[in-house]
């Protein structure tokens, strides 16, 4: 039986593993399955499928289960590379209309063929030599633009987020585990302006509000839907189960496990 594989080949500059998408990312799932939550929607990829997670959005990949197979290739289209590409190829941008945070691209034989052509470039560690990063990223980007010219309006839009409705944005995105300065940037504000506007709306500091909202959701999920604490803490924006349990008890006077056990006895 084949051993479970959870492997990622990254082509491009290193990226910080966080729930803020700082650069455009092209995903190709070589084998297995992967899923994630980008913007306000769930997405899933199966073997041979691919898509683009767009920059300046919030998103997270669901952790692979113990026996799952997930082998994927990620191309990072960072801004310096895209600017150089645009200058070299004299790209004329078109208007890009989709607001989706994760773009499922239509099936086309060119993409799998390109991925297959990477085979000879892998070293013994299963990685592609950095000397070929730009060449291969350029080749893939040319294919994508040939298949969907309107993607030029996505890749070559170097603008920064504009000021938006902070209350609506936070009520929609508070479960994402990102630093407050990321929330400020995505709402088109400096950090000081964000904190000032936030307090004027919610009458609470961002950090306290975020923890309280996440814990209130946790209480409802455990009490009403009988969810297990270990199954929900990551989706609610907590990094560690121990921190989640400590914060939960401080707010509600009992641990999430105690609440779950009480609910189980009542069933």
Positions of predicted regions on the chain:
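N-terminal regulatory/effector-sensing and dimerization cores
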Residues: 1-96
């Amino acid at each position: 039986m084949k051993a479970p594989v959870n492997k990622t080949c990254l082509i491009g500059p290193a990226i910080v593993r966080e729930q803020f998408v700082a650069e455009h990312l092209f995903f190709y799932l070589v084998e297995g399955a992967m899923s994630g939550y980008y913007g306000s929607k769930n997405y899933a990829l199966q073997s041979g499928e691919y898509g683009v997670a767009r920059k300046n959005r919030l998103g997270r990949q669901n952790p692979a289960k113990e026996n799952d197979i997930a082998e994927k290739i990620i191309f990072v289209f960072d801004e310096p590379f895209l600017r150089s590409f645009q200058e070299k190829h004299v790209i004329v941008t078109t208007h890009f209309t989709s607001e989706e945070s994760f773009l499922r691209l239509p099936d086309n034989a060119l993409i799998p063929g390109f991925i297959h052509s990477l085979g000879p470039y892998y070293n013994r560690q299963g990685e592609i030599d950095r000397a070929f990063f730009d060449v291969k990223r350029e080749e893939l980007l040319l294919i994508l633009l040939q298949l969907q010219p309107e993607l030029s309006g996505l890749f070559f839009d170097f603008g920064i987020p504009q000021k938006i409705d902070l209350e609506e944005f936070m009520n929609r995105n508070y479960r994402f585990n990102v630093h407050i300065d990321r929330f400020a940037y995505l709402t088109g504000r400096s950090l000081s302006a964000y904190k000032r506007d936030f307090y004027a709306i919610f009458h609470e500091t961002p950090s306290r509000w975020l923890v309280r909202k996440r814990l209130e959701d946790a209480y409802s999920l455990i009490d009403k839907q009988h969810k297990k604490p270990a199954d929900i803490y990551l989706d609610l924006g907590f990094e560690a189960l121990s921190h989640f349990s400590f914060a939960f008890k401080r707010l509600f006077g009992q641990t999430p496990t105690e609440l779950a056990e009480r609910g189980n006895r009542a069933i």
